């Protein structure tokens, strides 16, 4: 059994010597089983200013509306299937149920149009049950939407749209009705899961905890998980974890990576990226094609016809680029300076990095997203 008073005293002593590059344990790891749960529901938004679903094209909206009316004892006459409800929209409602959320607490919800509603601005979400993956209702949502975008259309068909008016949020729009069972207070141990698996970081966490509490209190399961002995008393367990999660850990250096987004031209080069000795030159070839048609005018009394004769001019120009050389163990700063000296655009830099990787000179993972 852990000596909890000894733990408090040791933690107080360790808190006076924190590393400069250290990070809190709570920022790099989470407790197994302590997580949020996703909820989803289907409902109706009413009160729209003529921007709701076109019910002839979205029959499920009218069906949902009729089902709601029947719950209030209102029967819709037969043959009214072509009724237009321009101020009603069918929506999906989603929310994250935080860990340890209790009945009566409020959570934020996101409301998104399912049909062809133009805008949910000014709408009110009617009572909507939110279910978990197990089919149970964990929260009830209702309230007025906050929509950041808007949509406007003129009589001539001109239209302007700002942001996304077909989705919105309701802060505190759902009331928790059922708590999710948690295994936090069960057993004599807890498992810490690293946000990024790293054997060096896992070992440093184990060493830090064992130095403070004694050998064998923390054990590494693998590069991403650590098992820690914990008090059986729930109140002591909370105090115990409040100390552990504030421990300062010096995490291991991340794997060297170069991330390339080919769609946006964004390139991110990690700090640990290095280049082996290599020489690089990257030319820029520009091909210009211009059309300069001429008019052929026949001579008088020749019975000829005036005609347009195409005339194309093709010009190819290649810009000379100086060669730059990477020495052994070239760092990120040196890579950036060398690339800037030749004036390489993002597209050129992508080609250079890919060529370096193929040549075996780029000591990093090249990831294209």
Swiss-Prot record:
Gene Ontology MF terms in the entry: structural molecule activity
Record bears the keyword Signal: yes
GO biological process, one term: bacterial-type flagellum-dependent cell motility
Principal localisation: periplasm
Keyword Signal: yes
Signal sequence interval, chain numbering: 1-22
InterPro entries the record matches: Flag_FlgI (IPR001782)
Location relative to the cell: Periplasm; Bacterial flagellum basal body
Example of a GO cellular component annotation carried by this entry: outer membrane-bounded periplasmic space
Superkingdom: Bacteria
Keywords: Bacterial flagellum, Periplasm, Signal
Alphabetical list of HAMAP family matching this protein: FlgI (MF_00416)
Function comment: Assembles around the rod to form the L-ring and probably protects the motor/basal body from shearing forces during rotation.
Family: Belongs to the FlgI family.
Subunit structure: The basal body constitutes a major portion of the flagellar organelle and consists of four rings (L,P,S, and M) mounted on a central rod.
Protein name: Flagellar P-ring protein
Taxonomic lineage from the root: Bacteria, Pseudomonadati, Pseudomonadota, Gammaproteobacteria, Pseudomonadales
């Amino acid at each position: 059994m852990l000596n909890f008073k000894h733990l408090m005293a040791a933690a107080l002593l360790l808190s006076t010597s924190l590393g400069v590059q250290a990070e809190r344990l709570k920022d790099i790891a989470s407790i197994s089983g302590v997580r949020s749960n996703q909820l989803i529901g289907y409902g109706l938004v009413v009160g729209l200013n003529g921007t709701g679903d076109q019910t002839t094209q979205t029959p499920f909206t009218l069906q949902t509306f009729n089902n709601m009316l029947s719950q209030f004892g209102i029967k819709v006459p037969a043959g009214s299937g072509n009724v237009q409800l321009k101020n009603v929209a069918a929506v999906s409602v989603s929310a994250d149920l935080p860990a340890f959320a209790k009945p009566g607490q409020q959570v934020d919800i996101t409301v998104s149009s399912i049909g062809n509603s133009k805008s949910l601005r000014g709408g009110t979400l009617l009572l909507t049950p939110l279910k978990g993956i197990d089919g149970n209702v964990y929260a009830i949502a209702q309230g007025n939407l906050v929509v950041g975008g808007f949509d406007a259309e003129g009589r001539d068909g001109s239209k302007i749209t700002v942001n996304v008016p077909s989705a919105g949020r309701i802060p505190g729009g759902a009331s928790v009705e059922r708590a999710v069972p948690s295994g936090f207070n069960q057993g004599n141990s807890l498992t810490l899961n690293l946000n990024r698996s790293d054997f060096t970081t896992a070992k440093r966490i184990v060493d830090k905890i064992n130095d403070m509490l004694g050998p064998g209190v923390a054990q590494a399961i693998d590069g991403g998980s650590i098992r820690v002995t914990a008090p059986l008393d729930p109140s002591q367990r909370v105090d115990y974890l409040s100390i552990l999660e504030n421990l300062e850990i010096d995490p291991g250096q991340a794997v060297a990576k170069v991330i390339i987004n080919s769609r946006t031209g964004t390139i991110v080069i990690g700090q640990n990226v290095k280049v082996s000795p290599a020489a690089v030159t990257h030319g820029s070839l520009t091909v210009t094609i211009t059309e300069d048609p001429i008019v052929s005018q026949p001579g008088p009394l020749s019975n000829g016809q005036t005609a347009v004769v195409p005339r194309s001019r093709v010009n190819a120009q290649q810009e000379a680029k100086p060669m730059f050389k990477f020495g052994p163990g070239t760092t990120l700063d040196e890579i950036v300076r060398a690339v800037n000296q030749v004036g390489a655009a993002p597209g050129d830099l992508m080609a250079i990095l890919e060529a370096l990787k193929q040549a075996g000179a780029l000591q990093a993972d090249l990831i294209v997203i």
